[in-house]
Each structure stands twice: as C-alpha cells, then as structure tokens.
Amino acid sequence: MENFIFHTELKSELNFLIENSHKLDGVLCFHGLAGCGKTTFAKYYSHLVSKEVHLYDASSHLFDKGSASNILKQINETGRSLSEFTDGGKYNADAFWNHCFIIDEWSNLSASRQNAYKVTLERVSKEMNALFILIINTSKECKIDKVLTSAILSRCQTVDFDIKAEHIDEVTELVKERYSMLDEEYIRKTLPDMRQIAKRAKLLS
C-alpha cells in the first residue's frame, strides 16, 4: 500500500477492504476520473485476496466478438477458457477468494450488456467463490448512477477514487515527497491525474 499515493480517507477505506475481503458480497466497483489509480490498485488488491486473478478489458476486441452472455460463459468455463485471459495464474494460495475477475473499462458496456451480467455476477461469485471488480470512469458531469445501470449498481460495493477539493493539499504534499523533481504548481494543475504525474516524474528523473 505504501507504493500508492492516496489521501487518508481513501487509504483507510482500502485497508478496510484488504482486512475484510472475506465479508464482501462478491462485487466491487472502483470509480473515479481516469488516471487516479483504480486499475493499478485493483491488480494489487486482487493478488492479495484471491488465488487466481483474471483481467478483462471491456474496450478490447475480445468484448466485440460476442455478447456479454458469451463472455460470461467463458468465465464459467474456468478450466478451459480462462487461461488465455489470466494475467499470470495462481497467486495467494491462502486467500479467501478462489478467483478475482477484474473487468476494466466497464463503463464502455451499454446498458443492455451491463444488465446481461446482473444475475450471473451473483451466481458465479457464489458457485466459484469469485470476487468481481468492475472499474469505471466517472466525473462530476457523469456520475456513477449515470454510468452503471440501477441493477448493477445495487449489486456493487462502490469505492470512490477521486481526489476532491478537500484532499488536494494532502495529496500534493504526498506527491512532492515522492517526486521531489516536480514543482507544486505542476502537481496542483495536473491532479487528480496521477498517471500523468508519474510519467512526468519519470521523464525528469
């Protein structure tokens, strides 16, 4: 967790999820602006709490070849189909969850495709002891209830990764400590896009 630059409130929430992953119902949704660390943390978290991690990208060609229901059939066929999607195989043998399915760019799915998952998310989670992490981009103009259908939203425990106005000062100081080559004006102008900040720091290092 020390490798992430998150404000105290978010870090506390994420630590709680790490310590209590066994209490989750089976579907998490990480949301916020692009570049704020949702996908990177999802990968880190999934390796901690599950035996196998499987990463999907809803914007890739894999999701264009068939309907959402066909993709879910592939998820069900873990032994035969998931090997081509897994990001490296088995991890934590002592983890509570047998599988973690990360679906990045979930917000690219239409409402009808999202709703095709609503029953299967629950069923697969129970039958396979699987955790799903849905990752979506949200903003002030496009909030989570505008991105997720009500059926999917009601099945998710949501985590907001956004850096709000009250967090800017704290996060700015954390970034300055991590990337001393960056000036404060640039940091404040670029937040909350931590991806761009990291790229700039790498360029100047």
Question: Positions of the model-derived regions?
Answer:
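Non-catalytic interfacial helical region
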Residues: 16, 52-205
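Walker A/P-loop
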Residues: 19, 25-60
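Generic alpha-helix structural propensity
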Residues: 9, 37-40, 112
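Conserved phosphate/pyrophosphate-binding and hydrolysis machinery centered on Walker-type P-loop NTPases
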Residues: 4-8, 35, 187-194
